[in-house]
A protein has these predicted regions:
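Amphipathic interaction/junction segments at domain boundaries or subunit interfaces
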Residues: 65-71, 75-164
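Short, hydrophobic/π-rich interface segment
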Residues: 138-196
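Short, well-structured alpha-helical interface segments that form or flank functional binding sites
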Residues: 68, 176, 199
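N-terminal, charged low-complexity regulatory/assembly segments
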Residues: 1-77
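Charged/polar, low-hydrophobicity segments characteristic of intrinsically disordered regions
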Residues: 25-31, 54-57, 99-113, 190
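Short acidic-glycine loop/turn motifs at beta-strand connectors
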Residues: 143-144, 208-210
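C-terminal edge-of-domain segments
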Residues: 198-208
Length: 210
């Protein structure tokens, strides 16, 4: 994967927040936070370079790029964080003001015909059959009309985190689904299993609020 484009853009958008939250959540002093960030950047670029390019129709490239960034930061920390603290750190790092705006904007189109069509197309794509760093998903609309579920049987984040030796920390990344759903303001996120915790699949259920 080329660093120019989305990977570069994501670093520009989020690196400052990742650095700030090293102090706010994980308790590193400002100098250490700067040093971690400085070390993480080449690590991030190296991870990105090892990844294949995603197909044009694959909507999950950003998910993998984000996980490459958090992976690079973890590998650059002097001490490996616990899952619960990493969960808080990752959520706060990702939920910048522009990201919250993006979630609200996405929320406005949730459950529209266009959204449903896009979800069905993603399920049909089965991108992980050709790219192990992508996702395979089945799509289910709830029979009572209350929303829908994406059920993932292959997960690019799981593959990457295993390669980085960070698989036990993957649940911290999974939890961002709840945070983003809440920020969108129109759905209640429901989940029974995750692949990262040994489940048969990872279910992402979106129920209409109210």
């Amino acid at each position: 994967m080329k660093y120019a484009g989305m990977p570069f853009g994501m670093w520009v958008l989020f690196a400052g927040s990742f650095q700030k939250q090293l102090t706010a959540v994980l308790g590193y002093d400002a100098d250490t936070a700067r040093a971690i960030t400085k070390k993480a950047k080449p690590q991030y670029r190296q991870i990105i370079r090892r990844l294949p390019e995603f197909e044009k129709a694959d909507r999950f490239k950003m998910n993998l790029v984000n996980s490459a960034m958090i992976g690079a930061f973890i590998l650059s920390m002097p001490q490996r964080p616990e899952v619960d603290r990493l969960t808080d750190y990752y959520a706060r790092s990702m939920m910048t003001a522009p990201m919250q705006w993006f979630c609200r904007k996405s929320g406005k189109s949730k459950f529209t015909a266009k959204d449903i069509t896009a979800m069905k197309a993603t399920a049909a794509l089965k991108a992980a059959d050709r790219n192990p760093y992508s996702w395979n998903m089945d799509f289910y609309e709830y029979t009572d009309g209350s929303g829908y579920e994406g059920r993932f049987t292959k997960c690019g984040i799981c593959v990457l985190m295993k390669e980085l030796g960070l698989y036990d920390l993957t649940p911290a990344l999974c939890h961002l689904d709840y945070t983003m759903s809440e920020a969108g303001g129109v759905t209640d996120f429901v989940r029974q299993y995750t692949l990262a915790s040994g489940g048969p699949y990872c279910d992402c259920g979106y129920k209409k609020k109210g």
